[in-house]
């Protein structure tokens, strides 16, 4: 653990090796597709074809020990967390901003902007491990800017933690 950092998610990996073809984002990261396009002056492909060619793309790469359940709607996330806590599971709820959580649910806050969420993401996943949670219900940030990279990491954490 290198401690707190400003960006949080790892670097963006871009493949520029195919002459005449647009660059391809192999792994979204702290530098967004929009930022790359602004520098290059033309679009980049956001989805690579074929098998993964970048590190950090395996589903389990980001998975904490707790099962991760990504839920888009805060009310649905609260209901899911409450039900699982009532069933006896040690449950956490990771949200962009502070919310009042049901009894038996541990609140974890990532940050109310995609950038703040990205900077806090890995610390919150490790905190879920330190707390010994069985389940971490996650409300992701919007799918814009670095939020795309955060959602990618959350999807991988959820896939890698599926029980």
PLM regions: where:
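Active-site-adjacent structural elements in enzyme catalytic cores
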Residues: 2-163
């Amino acid at each position: 653990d290198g401690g707190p950092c400003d960006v949080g998610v790892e670097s963006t990996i871009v493949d520029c090796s195919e002459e005449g073809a647009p660059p391809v984002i192999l792994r979204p990261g702290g530098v967004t597709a929009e930022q790359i396009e602004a520098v290059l002056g033309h679009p980049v492909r956001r989805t690579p074809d074929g098998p993964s060619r970048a590190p950090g793309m395996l589903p389990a790469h980001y998975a904490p020990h707790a099962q991760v359940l990504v839920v888009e709607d805060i009310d649905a996330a609260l209901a899911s967390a409450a039900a699982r806590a009532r069933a006896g599971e040690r449950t956490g709820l990771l949200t962009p901003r502070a919310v009042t959580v049901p009894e038996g649910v541990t609140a974890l806050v990532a940050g109310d902007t995609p950038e703040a969420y990205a900077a806090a993401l890995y610390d919150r996943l490790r905190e879920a491990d330190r707390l010994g949670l069985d389940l971490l219900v996650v409300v992701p940030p919007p799918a814009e800017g670095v939020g795309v990279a955060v959602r990618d990491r959350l999807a991988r954490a959820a896939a890698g933690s599926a029980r």
